[in-house]
């Protein structure tokens, strides 16, 4: 018997402005790791988080 998959999974959130914007404070892309409940939030998450590269709060989207 195999072990059942957990309901909570680890996800990565990436800044949407760092990908397209070249005028930023430093090079790189801001990424956060967090957990989400697969049953309550089956779609991809978008959260407003602080980006140290853009030096402001931006929308971070879930990536694979």
Curated annotation (Swiss-Prot):
Compartments it resides in: Plastid, Chloroplast
UniProt GO cellular component terms: chloroplast; ribonucleoprotein complex; ribosome
Keywords, in A-Z order: Chloroplast, Plastid, Ribonucleoprotein, Ribosomal protein
Cited InterPro entries: Ribosomal_bL33 (IPR001705), Ribosomal_bL33_CS (IPR018264), Ribosomal_bL33_sf (IPR038584), Ribosomal_zn-bd (IPR011332)
Domain of life, source organism: Eukaryota
Gene Ontology MF, one: structural constituent of ribosome
GO biological-process terms attached to the record: translation
Family of this protein: Belongs to the bacterial ribosomal protein bL33 family.
Protein name: Large ribosomal subunit protein bL33c
Organism: Trieres chinensis (Marine centric diatom)
Gene that encodes the chain: rpl33
